A protein has these predicted regions:
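Active-site recognition of the HExxH zinc-binding catalytic motif
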Residues: 47, 207-228, 232-233
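Post-HExxH zinc-binding segment in Zn-dependent metallohydrolases
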Residues: 128-132, 222-263
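Auxiliary, metal-adjacent structural segments of Zn-dependent hydrolase domains
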Residues: 141-194, 200, 204
Length: 327
């Protein structure tokens, strides 16, 4: 590779390394969050998910550039186009690393809420599961009775987030949700454009919580546990369908913790669920297990590289709920 190509790789890589050495809270407060807020205001003027346009364009380049390089190699009978492509790919990778370490990692590594004391005493966990079961059962018919469309559910989740935090996140439905599905994602916070993008084709019981969760990321709650907690608290301020969606997600995480602590108590409580709630509970289990194999490994590695405990980080919201209910 030419000298300028090496420089184009080394400079962003060095800056990315520097970002990891700087205080993450300072980077979050002075760079990442102000940038996301500014870009969010700009992209909020259109219903088109700008971030989706960008990653579709990048995906097209990933497919087309190797084909072009292969054609040029055959035409010119030279490996030079392939070497150029490798250099360009390395440059793009280094720039991507810089974008993540500057615009997302500081937010993900900075805790916004006080850390809860990890306490999962069986009695407290039993009580939490029973409370969430009762809440879900009391609201179980609301989602079927609601005439809200997917877009309206997303808007309602944004309104609930604004009611809780005083700020409305920028959450948009993906135009091609199946592409997110192929990646094992229900939604994504795209810090480059200040948007949260979610799959609008999700089941209605899933969509409000996913929208609120990704919206929490867009507002600066980078921890998965914090984003889950904020989403749950926000949805409890909304209409009954939103409260039901929030209760079902919280119930899933509480029951998942109970299954590890006391499998017999878990089995007893799942058998006590009504058919309607049990159906949605099973849907949530399938949803949480959708990412498998390589996709699950990549997600786990990404979370760990950003200072979290892998995929188990989502369930840590239960520690917050248990602490809130503690005497």
């Amino acid at each position: 590779m030419k000298k300028r190509t090496w420089i184009a790789c080394i400079v962003p890589a060095a800056l990315a390394l520097l970002c990891t050495l700087l205080p993450q809270r300072m980077l979050s407060q002075r760079v990442a969050l102000p940038y996301q807020a500014f870009m969010g205001k700009l992209t909020a003027h259109t219903n088109v998910p700008v971030g989706e346009v960008i990653y579709l364009a990048l995906g097209a380049l990933v497919l087309l550039l190797p084909l072009r390089a292969g054609f040029l190699c055959l035409r010119d009978r030279s490996w030079l186009p392939a070497r150029r492509l490798i250099g360009q790919a390395l440059c793009a990778l280094c720039v991507g690393m810089l974008a993540i370490t500057l615009l997302w990692s500081p937010i993900a590594r900075t805790k916004t809420l006080p850390a809860p004391l990890p306490s999962r005493l069986p009695r407290a966990l039993y009580d939490l599961c029973d409370h969430l079961m009762a809440q879900a059962e009391s609201l179980s018919g609301s989602m079927d009775d609601s005439a809200l469309t997917s877009d309206q559910l997303i808007d309602a989740a944004q309104d609930a987030m604004a009611a809780l935090t005083g700020r409305a996140p920028v959450v948009k439905a993906a135009r091609y949700p199946e592409l997110l599905g192929k990646l094992g994602l229900a939604g994504v916070c795209f810090p480059l454009t200040g948007e949260a993008i979610v799959r609008g084709d999700l089941a209605r019981v899933l969509l409000p919580f996913v929208a609120a969760h990704e919206g929490a990321h867009q507002l600066g709650y980078g921890s998965e546990a914090e984003a889950n907690l904020i989403a749950y608290r926000a949805l409890q301020l909304g209409k009954q369908p939103l409260r039901y969606a929030g209760a079902m997600f919280a119930l899933y995480y509480a029951m998942d913790a109970l299954k590890d602590a006391d499998p017999a108590a878990y089995a007893e409580r799942t058998s006590a669920l009504s058919q309607r709630v049990l159906s949605d509970f099973d849907r949530l289990i399938r949803f949480q297990r959708a990412a498998t194999g390589l996709r699950a490994g990549v997600l786990d590695a990404f979370l760990r590289l950003n200072g979290q405990s892998g995929r188990t980080a989502y369930g840590l919201m239960i520690d917050y709920l248990l602490e809130a209910d503690a005497p």
